[in-house]
Amino acid sequence: MIGAVNSVEAVITSIQGLSGSPEDLSALHDLLRGAQDSLRAEPGVNFSTLDQLDASKHSLGYLYFLEVLTCGPVSKEKAAYEIPIIARFINSCDAGQIRLASYKFVSLCKILKDHVIALGDPLRGVGPLLNAVQKLQVSSKRLTALHPDVLQLCLQAKSYKSGFSILSDDIVEIDQPRDFFLYSYYGGMICIGLKRFQKALELLYNVVTAPMHQVNAIALEAYKKYILVSLIHNGQFTNTLPKCASTAAQRSFKNYTGPYIELGNCYNDGKIGELEALVVARNAEFEEDKNLGLVKQAVSSLYKRNILRLTQKYLTLSLQDIANMVQLGNAKEAEMHVLQMIQDGQIHALINQKDGMVRFLEDPEQYKSSEMIEIMDSVIQRTIGLSKNLLAMDESLSCDPLYLGKVGRERQRYDFGDDFDTVPQKFSM
């Protein structure tokens, strides 16, 4: 049982009296840390205890009690009861107070995520966790431990737009590498769901090129999707990894992603029949990876790539000619592909329904409209912001004792002294 000093009533009274100034909150935090083991062992602590606290005013104390009440084995009934309580707390709590015990807040939010997944209702957790991210973030540039969890719920709920709302900020501060890997991987999948393939490529690229001593499962899955999205969006596959990719990635990716590399090489050859035959042969592997839908989009994009090539050679073509040249079944299929490409802005063309002729046009965009100027200005401002972030990171590194110590040790290995020739001595051979 809890002693007189740490009785539940005494803790409640302390929470009510010490939830004001920063100094009081610091003292309260020390008290709660000392009392948490006793609170877990106290049978008198139950959800009705929370009625004595205001979640918005006493957020720190409320968090400690809520963590005690939600720990342990979970049944579906317990999960269903706890979800609204946790969600209400997340939505109403004070950001400044919960940041004092951010690890507990993260743990509570992960409990909520597990609860909604267990009940098969991931959408129920999306809103509260989006609020949790905003409250936990000190800066929009910082990646929190909750970013991957939000994106995971959005993927399971197919609420892609909600997930995309936290992908627009440029992240420059990261605590745990695993959070970054998952954030970029799940974020890439969110963008694929929205068909924002350029952004998906950026995020998957971050996973593929991230520093790693040995390849992890997240990076391997990201590379598979990176290949497929490259085919869909860029219409080509590059067999060589970016130079900034780690040695582990350079060495291992090709060994574990053979079917995808084979698919990319076949795509580059431009022979649709061979590509479709390869997809049939490797169908089970693509389906096991849950990438068959993307593979089919890649095959479809080869038709579009071949149609795009025709626009560079011809001014007019019949739909039947297009079907024959790109190996489509009939003129109707060719018309569907051309219309989709016009809608996506990939080509500019007019289809004459009377004679089935397609007239290819020049790009009407003259880059003079107010909308285009706004887009260009936005890109310039983002670039300026990134430049400032890089300068700030460089200055921070230059003052970091650990970094300076490492640089000093490395420099000593190659410091030969002033009396050593700077140019190697030449010998006649």
Curated annotation (Swiss-Prot):
PROSITE patterns found in the cross-reference section: PCI (PS50250)
Assigned GO CC terms: COP9 signalosome; cytoplasm
Keywords: Cytoplasm, Developmental protein, Nucleus, Phytochrome signaling pathway, Signalosome
Family annotation (Gene3D superfamilies): 1.25.40.570
Subcellular location: Cytoplasm; Nucleus
Domain PCI: 196-365
Stated role: Component of the COP9 signalosome complex (CSN), a complex involved in various cellular and developmental processes such as photomorphogenesis and auxin and jasmonate responses. The CSN complex is an essential regulator of the ubiquitin (Ubl) conjugation pathway by mediating the deneddylation of the cullin subunits of SCF-type E3 ligase complexes, leading to decrease the Ubl ligase activity of SCF. It is involved in repression of photomorphogenesis in darkness by regulating the activity of COP1-containing Ubl ligase complexes.
Name of protein: COP9 signalosome complex subunit 3
Organism: Arabidopsis thaliana (Mouse-ear cress)
